[in-house]
């Protein structure tokens, strides 16, 4: 019953924001139309809004889980139209905070001790509040300033109920929407469920932060706050407290004397290093999660501070290689290579003609190369390439789509800091250097050395495994020979049967012809009372039937 009321409310909100137009021509749209008399009249202000804005406003009204749904949907640019995707990016994950005393209770249950014994001071008024968690300031007994991230009470059940409802809606859309095969609603909901499940485990988020910190511990480019593991559990995450300037606060950055040009180039370099050197990249890199160190000593060599580690990305080695090669092919305007790489990577079926893909890649990339370098976006090029490739049954792993969205965010942050940022000039040497190092003989020897214990462990078994493999090959060949003989015998049997069938058909036909000729008494030679042609047909027909019977 609760789910029914929730579904009714969703339908009511959809109608209020005229989202029924997104379902035109479907069974759902017809049912929604029946409910229109029970919904207040739509204001002229809403009618004048774009469909993307109407969807964004509706999701905000439906609550925090649907806001999170919209945010995740905005990352799937391969599935949603550009106008809707651009609007969903602007969704703000801000909700009313829950009681500070409730947060204290959750912390005490998770850590197994009182707040007073865990912290010297704990501020019950949150610093920030979002759909899944909220953050409180605190001080440890050793006087270190920290922030404590606490999951909302009963959030798991709320998410479970809303996910179940979304699954039902996705199934309905899949069966009624004419473009369901392109939208793939159940795939979207499954991805949302996976992402939310990861964000509900704060210990996992702490592990992500710890790994990223280890990669960049000695770097002047980014700083990752330390995880306080003694004060971290599945529902509570305690991190070193950071102070900085949001990367989109241009006025404050300028007032602090930060070199924005150096900062923007550094952001691009850091991203490509995370993807191709570390294979562990921050996948929620919007300006709210990227701050700038406000230390006056770092004005000329600014440093990023990274926050929120719930969504991290990793690529398979295969996708890493093909993505890097794609970037290099774009840099060199090698459209043939771009097409070949899409097929070799398995993103596009092998039956698609390379020439068609090459022409499609050229039509996407060439218009970008006519622009000033400061206006070229590598993320946009990749997004357009993938969008065009959908016509050729493009299949991408979710992590690649996540990377595409992250690259778009990183370029956006970089262009905010420096509108004249030349992403190609910054990215190309970094990518070339990383690829040279990654595929160098030294790196190959390093990887070999890393796997040497495994190789040495299995080395004694190698002769036995080779012998077993050779025996299998010999046995397989013998078995194949037997199968081949059986197939040949079967083929000969079928050929004989085919000849007998033909003889029987011919014989029967000739006997019928003989009987017809005998009955018609045609002009010509007769042997007694039998026409000669009838006699010849009968004899040949009888021989053919006897041949078919004798062979059987």
Curated annotation (Swiss-Prot):
Pathway: Cofactor biosynthesis; ubiquinone biosynthesis [regulation]. It is an enzyme of class 2 (transferase). The keyword Methyltransferase does not apply. One of its GO terms (molecular function) is ATP binding. Residues 121-504 form the Protein kinase domain. Keywords: ATP-binding, Cell inner membrane, Cell membrane, Kinase, Membrane, Nucleotide-binding, Transferase, Transmembrane, Transmembrane helix, Ubiquinone biosynthesis. ATP binds at residues 127-135, 149. The chain crosses the membrane at residues 501-521, 530-550. It is found in: Cell inner membrane. It is a multi-pass membrane protein. GO terms for cellular component: plasma membrane. This is Probable protein kinase UbiB. The lineage of its organism: Bacteria, Pseudomonadati, Pseudomonadota, Gammaproteobacteria, Lysobacterales. The gene is ubiB.
